[in-house]
Amino acid sequence: MNMNATLLGQAISFGMFVWFCMKYVWPPIIKAIEDRQKKIADGLQAAERAKKDLDLAQANASDQLKEAKRTATELIEQANKRKAQIIDEAREEAQAERQKILTQAEAEIEAERNRARDELRKQVATLAIAGAEKILERSIDKDTHKDILDNITAKL
């Protein structure tokens, strides 16, 4: 029976060891394992959230880039249209200025031509009167002179 008492003593010692381990050793180990599992799970969730945030940020950046390109294209088109409009306006203004200058020059030429004609008429009338005076050897009075000049001027 010695063996039974030894076996009983070992069983009691083993039971006390198991109880001691369950009471004092097992809870901190289980707590450490659970803390580690929670930490790993939180890390995985954070990584998943970060990946989703990254995907969202990349999508937003892509959308913003597309929007910026579209806006830039619109601005370039507007600038080109404005450039063409400014060029057309400048051409129209230049054409109007050219026409104005030509009209003014033609008017000046016409005025100068009329002045030259009047001057020439006066000279021709004066020469005609001088010639007529020499032919007639007499002087024409002022009223007759004026009538003759007006008549000759009108005919010329």
From Swiss-Prot:
One of its GO terms (cellular component) is proton-transporting ATP synthase complex. Pfam families: ATP-synt_B. It is found in: Cell inner membrane. The chain crosses the membrane at residues 7-29. InterPro entries: ATP_synth_B-like_membr_sf, ATP_synth_b/b'su_bac/chlpt, ATP_synth_F0_bsu_bac, ATP_synthase_B_chain. Signal peptide: none annotated. GO terms for molecular function: proton-transporting ATP synthase activity, rotational mechanism; proton-transporting ATPase activity, rotational mechanism. Keywords: ATP synthesis, Cell inner membrane, Cell membrane, CF(0), Hydrogen ion transport, Ion transport, Membrane, Transmembrane, Transmembrane helix, Transport. It is a single-pass membrane protein. F(1)F(0) ATP synthase produces ATP from ADP in the presence of a proton or sodium gradient. F-type ATPases consist of two structural domains, F(1) containing the extramembraneous catalytic core and F(0) containing the membrane proton channel, linked together by a central stalk and a peripheral stalk. During catalysis, ATP synthesis in the catalytic domain of F(1) is coupled via a rotary mechanism of the central stalk subunits to proton translocation. Component of the F(0) channel, it forms part of the peripheral stalk, linking F(1) to F(0). Belongs to the ATPase B chain family. F-type ATPases have 2 components, F(1) - the catalytic core - and F(0) - the membrane proton channel. F(1) has five subunits: alpha(3), beta(3), gamma(1), delta(1), epsilon(1). F(0) has three main subunits: a(1), b(2) and c(10-14). The alpha and beta chains form an alternating ring which encloses part of the gamma chain. F(1) is attached to F(0) by a central stalk formed by the gamma and epsilon chains, while a peripheral stalk is formed by the delta and b chains. This is ATP synthase subunit b. It comes from Vibrio cholerae serotype O1 (strain ATCC 39541 / Classical Ogawa 395 / O395). The lineage of its organism: Bacteria, Pseudomonadati, Pseudomonadota, Gammaproteobacteria, Vibrionales.
